[in-house]
């Protein structure tokens, strides 16, 4: 999916207008936890199947015995300079949270903040067209939205989906013995940092766009597999952060095999050369005390494992006998690099990497 480039030579680079980009814009997990602790505990609503308790990907509200609504919102500042690609990435990332609950998207609303007197109107329109193109690919309308004049460019979606109440996939239901399966290769944050430093070649940019604009559609089909116990997506807190959420939610230890992890081409060399995001360090500071990195890992391991993923892959915890079906579900939708990367075992709520 491409759009003919009609760039305005006088227009500033989108990434030059923001202090962060993509899911690297997220408030650091430690700070976010502290902020939420200062708010009132949520009231009890019997039909609210998923709320804020386990930092899950979306809210789920039961309408009746056959239907529940999945509701989520996601927006961020530019991770790339091409406005159409920015819109596509942001929309793909927002819809991922619906898929991560096992849901099927049905509707989106656009969330738009733009420096209206700085960016050409055609640039802003291209962002909107990018988001609409992804929603069309997902089979849903962008049915409205809200816009403001802001200092930094911001775009995203509020998205609604549907799921059967019995098929909701939480991030807190993994079981001892489950195998962890990852849907997409890692390293988007590193590539985005390289882009901002003019260190990313055309091939690197192409692979970044390909992975960040690929809808996590398998989530809907995974919800129908009884052997799938827990589901989330890997975004701003990096692989370690979101795996740790699975471990904490289940009260188990997650074991990750570093050698089994799929990486985007070139990211290890870039990190070795000092190209990484500030969010990587903030992530480690927030949760590194609950992670054990084994001896013999490469020097770049910590930075890569905490690298913030924008529009990252689904992370599945499933019974061992369901692994082949889970991998087939991914590969039937073109996720050729989906891989089993570890397992859940009895033990303290932490992540061990070997």
Swiss-Prot record:
Keywords: ATP-binding, Kinase, Magnesium, Metal-binding, Nucleotide-binding, Selenium, Transferase. One of its GO terms (molecular function) is magnesium ion binding. The active site is at residue 23. GO terms for cellular component: cytoplasm. The record marks 26 as: Important for catalytic activity. GO terms for biological process: selenocysteine biosynthetic process. Its cofactor is Mg(2+). It catalyses: hydrogenselenide + ATP + H2O = selenophosphate + AMP + phosphate + 2 H(+). It holds the Pfam family AIRS_C. ATP binds at residues 26, 54-56, 74, 97, 145-147. InterPro entries: PurM-like_C_dom (IPR010918), PurM-like_C_sf (IPR036676), PurM-like_N (IPR016188), PurM-like_N_sf (IPR036921), SelD_I (IPR023061), SPS/SelD (IPR004536). Mg(2+) binds at residues 57, 97, 233. Its EC number is 2.7.9.3. Gene3D superfamilies: PurM-like C-terminal domain, PurM-like, N-terminal domain. CDD domains: SelD. Binds 1 Mg(2+) ion per monomer. Synthesizes selenophosphate from selenide and ATP. Homodimer. Belongs to the selenophosphate synthase 1 family. Class I subfamily. This is Selenide, water dikinase. The gene is selD.
């Amino acid at each position: 999916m491409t759009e003919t480039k009609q760039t305005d030579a006088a227009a500033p680079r989108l990434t030059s207008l923001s202090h962060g980009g993509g899911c690297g814009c997220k408030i650091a997990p430690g700070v976010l936890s502290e902020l939420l602790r200062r708010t009132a505990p949520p009231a009890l609503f019997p039909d609210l199947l998923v709320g804020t308790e386990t930092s899950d990907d979306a809210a789920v509200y039961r309408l009746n015995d056959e239907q529940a609504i999945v509701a989520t919102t996601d927006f961020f500042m530019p991770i790339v300079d091409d406005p159409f690609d920015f819109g596509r990435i942001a929309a793909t990332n927002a819809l991922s949270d619906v898929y991560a609950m096992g849901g099927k998207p049905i509707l989106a609303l656009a969330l738009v903040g733009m420096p209206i007197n700085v960016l050409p109107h055609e640039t802003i329109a291209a962002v909107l067209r990018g988001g609409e193109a992804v929603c069309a690919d997902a089979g849903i309308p962008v049915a409205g939205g809200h816009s403001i004049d802001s200092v930094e460019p911001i775009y995203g979606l509020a998205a609604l989906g549907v799921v059967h109440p019995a098929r909701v996939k939480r991030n807190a239901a993994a079981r001892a013995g489950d195998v962890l399966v990852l849907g997409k290769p890692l390293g988007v944050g590193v590539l985005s940092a390289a882009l901002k430093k003019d260190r990313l070649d055309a091939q690197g940019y192409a692979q970044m766009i390909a992975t960040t604009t690929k809808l996590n559609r398998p989530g809907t089909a995974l919800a129908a597999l009884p052997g799938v116990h827990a589901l989330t997506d890997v975004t701003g807190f990096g692989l370690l952060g979101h795996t740790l959420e699975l471990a904490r939610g289940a009260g188990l230890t997650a074991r990750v095999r570093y050698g089994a992890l799929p990486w985007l081409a070139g990211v290890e060399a870039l990190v070795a050369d000092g190209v990484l995001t500030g969010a990587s360090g903030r992530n480690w500071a927030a949760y590194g005390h609950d992670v054990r990195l084994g001896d013999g890992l490469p020097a770049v391991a910590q930075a890569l494992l905490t690298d913030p993923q924008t529009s990252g892959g689904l992370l599945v915890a499933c019974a061992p006998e369901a692994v082949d079906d889970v991998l087939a579900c991914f590969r039937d939708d073109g996720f050729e690099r989906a891989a089993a990367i570890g397992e859940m075992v009895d033990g303290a709520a932490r992540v061990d990497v070997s």
